[in-house]
Amino acid sequence: MEISNSLEKDFGKKFVLSHKTIEKYFNHSGSLPYVARYRNEIIGYIIGIPLEYLDREPWTRIEKNFGKHNTIYTYAFVVLEEFRKNGYARMLKKVYLSKLEKLNNILYNSGHVRKGISSKFKGKIEVINHIDNWQGTGKTFEYYRREL
């Protein structure tokens, strides 16, 4: 939970994971949580969840794969600021995507990132939508879909 505090600086308090959220997404059947460690200290995590877990989110209506059970949504991806730009995030994402590629019936990975970030991703990436002031952050985000 301490790691998610780093999100507050960029996006606001509501992006800090609560114990309830951690329990829901780290321990829920079907979730794909991965943790990065440096000298036994947790320095980051990534959580993937089936897109269908987000059935209460209005934006899921634009996702053509909703209900097909073939997409893992990247719910959270956080690395402590002092460990960014050192390859830790890249390695964590690589392990995560490698696991997704091995899952039967999972054809896509999707998520929300700040506008322009998905253009740096490798592979077949499609930007589906842009959202101004995403979740009240004051920032424009894009919803992307990656073919695995």
List each language-model region with its residue ranges.
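Conserved acetyl-CoA-binding loop-helix of GNAT-fold acetyltransferases
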Residues: 76-79, 85-98
